[in-house]
Amino acid sequence: MTQDPGETPAGTAGAATADLTLDAEVAAADVPPAIIAQSLGQYLRASWLRVRSGNSGVLPVVLAIVIVAVVFEILTPEHAFLRPSNLVFIFGLSTVYMVLAIAETAVLLLAEVDLSVGAVALIGGVIAFKLVQQPGANWPWWLALLAALVICGAIGAAQGALTAILRIPSFVVSLGGFLLFSGILIVVLGGADASVNLSTSMTNQRIIYDMVQGLISPVVAWIVLAVLVVAYGASQWLRTTSRRRQGLTAPPLSLIAIRIALVAIIGAAVVIICSVNRGSALKAVTGVPWVIPIVLVVLGGWTVLLQRTHFGRYVYAIGGNPEAARRAGVSVPAIRIWAFALCSATAALGGILLGSFFFGEYSTNTADPGQLVLYSIAAAVIGGVSLFGGRGKAIHGILGGLLIGSIAYGVSLLSLGSLSTPLEYILPGAVLLAAVLIDVLSRRGSGGVNRV
C-alpha cells in the first residue's frame, strides 16, 4: 500500500505524539520534568520548556556562583580566591547563611516573612554557649543545643500565632520581634560589653566549638562520602523501580545515573579541596569541616519535610492559594504557627554555628542581627525561593547562602579599603533585586501560577 505523502510515517507517529503530549503537560501542569519525561532527551526538552516558561529553577543562581567565582579569581591579588584555604573558609562562612536561608524559606513559602530571624539566631547561640559554661549551668552539650532550639522554636510559635490567629501581618510582628529580641540579646549576654567564650580544653564546650572549627580526617571523609553516595544511589534506584512496579511514572534510569554521578563528583571535589594542606609544613591542617555534614543533615531534613510529608504539601498549598487550602480542609493557622516555630528553631542552629565560626566567642560585635536577617532573606530569594509564596526548596537556600558567602569573602579579598564595606551591601543587594525581578517577570509570563 502506498503511503500518503502528507501522512505522518508510522514509525515517527508515536514519538511525535509523545513530544506533543510532553509539551502540553509541561505547559499546562506544574509537574517536574523528571516525572513527565520517559527518556533523558525528553527530560532535557521538558526542562528547557520550563525555563522558557519562567521556571528556571536553580539555573540562575548556579550561573551566578560560577560568574562570581571567575570574576573574583581574576580580580583578587595573586588570583587567590579559588585557593583551597579560601574555599574552605567560604564553605564555613556560607554555612551560616545557608542555615538561616533555609529557616527563612519555611515562612517565605507561605508568602510571609520573618524579620526577627537574625536576632533569634543570635539568642539561640548565646543560650547554648551560656548553658555549657563552667562554672554555670554546665549542661551537656546536646542538652544545651536542644534547649536553644526549643526556646527559639517557642519564640517562633508565638510570633506565628500572632500572625495566624490574630491576623497581624508577619512583617509587623517580626519587625517588632527583631527590635525586642535584639534588646533581649544584650540582656542574655550580660551587658553591651559582655561576651561568652567557649573553652577548647573542656570536652563539653569543645564539641560546640568544633561544629565549624573541627575537622574530619581525609580518610574518614572519603569513607563517609562513599557511604553517602551508595545510600543516595540506592534510595533513588529503589524509589524509581518501586514507582515503575506500581505503574506510576518515574524518572528515566539514565537521569538517575547522572544524578548519582553528579553527587559523587561534587562530594569528591569538596573532599579533595579540603584535603589540601591549609597550614604550614610544620603544622599541617587538612580535613573536611564538621559543619559540612551538619548542613547536609539540615538540608536532608528540610527536603524530606517539604517534599515528602503532608506538612510540606500543605505549606506549598497555602503559599499558592490559602483560601483554596482552607476549603480543602487544611488547618491554615496551625501550619503557619508550625512554620514560624521551625523557622526560629532552625535559625537557632544557625546562630550556634555562627558562634563556632568565630572561634567559640559571642559578643554584641559578633554579628549584626539586622545584617543577618537581610542576608538570610537575600540568600533564600537569590537561591530561587519566591517572595510571593508557593515556590522554593531547601536546596535553594543552600545555593543562595553559598553565593552570599562568596560575595562577602570575595569583597574582603579585594583590599579596597573604605570601599569594601559598602560593596558587601551593594553587591548582594543588586543580586537580590535581579532575583526578585526574575521572579516577578516569570510569574507574569506564566500567568501567576505558583510552581514548586
Please place each PLM-identified region on the residue numbering:
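Membrane-interfacial amphipathic/re-entrant helices at transmembrane-helix boundaries
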Residues: G6, P32-V99, Q134-L143, T249, ...
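Single transmembrane alpha-helix segments in multi-pass membrane proteins
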Residues: A69-I74, P84-Q134, Q159-F171, A324, ...
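Inter-helical junctions in multi-pass inner-membrane proteins, predominant
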Residues: E78-N86, I186, G190-A192, C274-I292, ...
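Transmembrane alpha-helical segments in multi-pass inner-membrane proteins
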Residues: E112, F340-A347, G351, G355-I426
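Alpha-helical transmembrane segments within multi-pass membrane transporters and channels
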Residues: A137-L179, G400, I404
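Loop-to-transmembrane alpha-helix initiation sites
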Residues: W141, S170, N197-M202, S217-V227, ...
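Transmembrane helix-bundle core of multi-pass membrane transporters
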Residues: S182-L306, G417-S418, S446-V452
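Membrane-helix/interface signature in polytopic inner-membrane proteins
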Residues: Q236-L253, G301-F340
